[in-house]
């Protein structure tokens, strides 16, 4: 649903390895002043982060945004829960899908678009170990084919 246009700040590379991403949503983020300054400086990390719906609102948990270096005593807490801004229809879709067994909301990347910090979240279904191995095999086979075609064209 949402394609990134701006500068990518942080990516969750493990998300596509651990989950089948079925649908993506672009969400705005409610941030404090020092948080947006740290994000613009590229000091955000999505490792081990997840999103959860509570009271009809979506929150991003465990997203680490480092404290701003020039911040004073009013600096933000690095891993606090941050509210994500979505349309009501999108939230209802997420609520309905996450109540099914095995589905979760996974943050994929944080980026700046038109001056605003956005978070691309995906509706993911957990992969089993054999699915992960199959994905790796498929990717390796694709690399081998591309390598063979490249050498053939020389």
Curated annotation (Swiss-Prot):
PROSITE patterns noted in UniProt: SSRP
InterPro entries: SmpB (IPR023620), SsrA-bd_prot (IPR000037), SsrA-bd_prot_CS (IPR020081)
Residue numbers spanned by region Disordered: 134-154
Molecular-function GO terms, alphabetical: RNA binding
UniProt keywords, alphabetically: Cytoplasm, RNA-binding
GO cellular component terms, A-Z: cytosol
Keyword RNA-binding: yes
Swiss-Prot/TrEMBL GO biological process terms: trans-translation
Localization, UniProt: Cytoplasm
Family: Belongs to the SmpB family.
Role played: Required for rescue of stalled ribosomes mediated by trans-translation. Binds to transfer-messenger RNA (tmRNA), required for stable association of tmRNA with ribosomes. tmRNA and SmpB together mimic tRNA shape, replacing the anticodon stem-loop with SmpB. tmRNA is encoded by the ssrA gene; the 2 termini fold to resemble tRNA(Ala) and it encodes a 'tag peptide', a short internal open reading frame. During trans-translation Ala-aminoacylated tmRNA acts like a tRNA, entering the A-site of stalled ribosomes, displacing the stalled mRNA.
Name listed for the protein in its UniProt record: SsrA-binding protein
Organism of provenance: Halalkalibacterium halodurans (strain ATCC BAA-125 / DSM 18197 / FERM 7344 / JCM 9153 / C-125)
Gene designation per UniProt: smpB
